[in-house]
């Protein structure tokens, strides 16, 4: 299998956890404490809690933070956060939004005008993986920055959390790391040890290759010619990701067809979550739904030789042409 969708679909492993990590108020829980300390040390934070990476889970975080100040959310965050933020507003709470520009970057003018005390914004945009300069964001606001660190982490984030499904393939709780008293302390019996163990294990195994993007891009342009276009600048995306679009087809058509060739690609988060929805982020950039269905994202976790890359592109071009012919009939 040639897996080019790892940031959306993880390499799922068997889930194994020792009974040594089970929690009890009648023992010292040394093994869990060591695991927790290892996780906190890895990202230089002092506190760790677990919560549900879902609409209800993020709504809970928003409600907790609303007692302390105003909140802003980047429209380029995960589906679960966006849904939670919309529900938060529907309950009568105020919330500021940071929009996306046509080129996929965050609208920095929205950041400049923020009055928020807390911002949910990550070092990359979901789906396109356009990088976000959190250092610049931090220079423009005193707000606490809370980020998704699943695909990339930044030292300018004041708190980070992880998308368990995309890291492990299991819908376990998420881990949230922070300092001081940003969130309430969590009693040990409520901490999801299976999630802590699994996420840390997945992060240890996480591996990306940065040498493949330019080669794949050149070969794609060579193979597709005028049928390929780019909605975002590939120089502005994570070094191990490539985002592009193919004219006059729906991404799901080529995603499903290539799966039969054991080549796995994706359109974005709506694809990986089983929502059967085209990329929300592309639409938030100002493109119509039809364009968002053209979008395709690659992630590079393995180094391929030039012959292998050319073979993959050849298959991709062949399937694309076949789909176009069938659609024209």
Say what each PLM segment does:
Residues 1-22, 218-222, 226:
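N-terminal glycine-rich, Lys/His-bearing helix-loop that initiates the first secondary-structure elements
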